[in-house]
C-alpha cells in the first residue's frame, strides 16, 4: 500500500506518525528489511517455476529408467530409506547426477524462503472458495466456515490432517486451502484411506520441518514469506486479477520511498539490500544502491569492486574499468581486481 500510493502518503501525516511510533518497537527496522528482501525473493518465483518445468522434471523422467534398474521401487520399504541401512550406491547415484545437484540447489532455495510450491498449486485455484477475493489472504484455520460441516466422529483423521497442515511452514495459506479442497475431490473411500495413512508420524514430521525452518529463518520471517506468497498468488491467479495493477511487475524499490527512508537509509540496511540484489543477479538494482553508498564512502575497495562488477555485468565496460581502477588504488593486492582490469582492457580493445 505504501508503495502503490507513494505519491499520496505525504497528504496523510498520520501515516508517518504511525510509522514513527512503530519505529520505537524493538526489531522494527529488521522487520522492514525482511519484508524488502522477501519481495526481492518473490521475483525468483517465475524462474523457479521454469527451472522445475524445463530442467528438474525432465531430468527426473530421464533418470527414472536408470533408477528402476538400480533400485526395485516395488520392494522398497520406509526402513530402507532411514537409519544406517541406506545403500551407499543409492546416495552416490543421486549425488553424482545432474538431478541431485539441482535438488540440492532447490532445497537451499526452500530453506531460504523461496516460493518453490507455486508451480505445484498454480492449477488448483479454481475452487469456489477462491472466487471470493478476501479468501486469498486468509490465514489457514480449521475454524473457517467452509469446514463447518466436515468434522464428524467418523472423520477425525481429516481434522488431524488439517491441524497438521496449519503448522506446515513450507506452504503458504492459499496453498493449504488448495491442498485440502483437492483432497476433498477424491472418492470417500480413497480419501479415508489417505487420511488414515496421515498418522502421527507424518504430523511429527511436519512439526519438525516447521521447527527447522523457523529456527533457520525465524517465526516472523516465515509469516512474512507466507503472506507475500499469498499476495503473489492473488495478483497472478485470482480470477479477476486483471482488474488490479500487478505490484509484482513494479520495481518495488522500497528503500527509495520517502516515507520509509528515515528507517532504512543507514549503511547497514542499504548494504544488506544491495548485497541481496547482487546475490540474485539483479545488477542494475544493486548498482543503484552501491553508487549511493559510494557517495559517502570513497575508501572501500570492496564497494568499488562490486560497483565495477555490476557495471561489467550490465555491459558498461568503461564504467567497470573506472571502478576497478579505483578499487586497485585502494588495494593493489587483489588478484581478482587485476584480472578484471585486464579483462576490461582486452574487451575494450576488441570493440
Region locations from a protein language model:
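Specific register positions within alpha-helical solenoid repeats of the TPR/Sel1-like families, i.e.
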Residues: 6-7, 278, 312, 346
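Non-catalytic protein-protein interaction scaffold segments in large eukaryotic complex-forming proteins
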Residues: 29, 33, 45, 49-200
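Extended alpha-helical scaffolding segments
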Residues: 1-46
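Alpha-solenoid helical-repeat scaffolds
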Residues: 141-330
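Conserved small/polar residues in nucleotide/adenosyl-binding loops
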Residues: 349-351
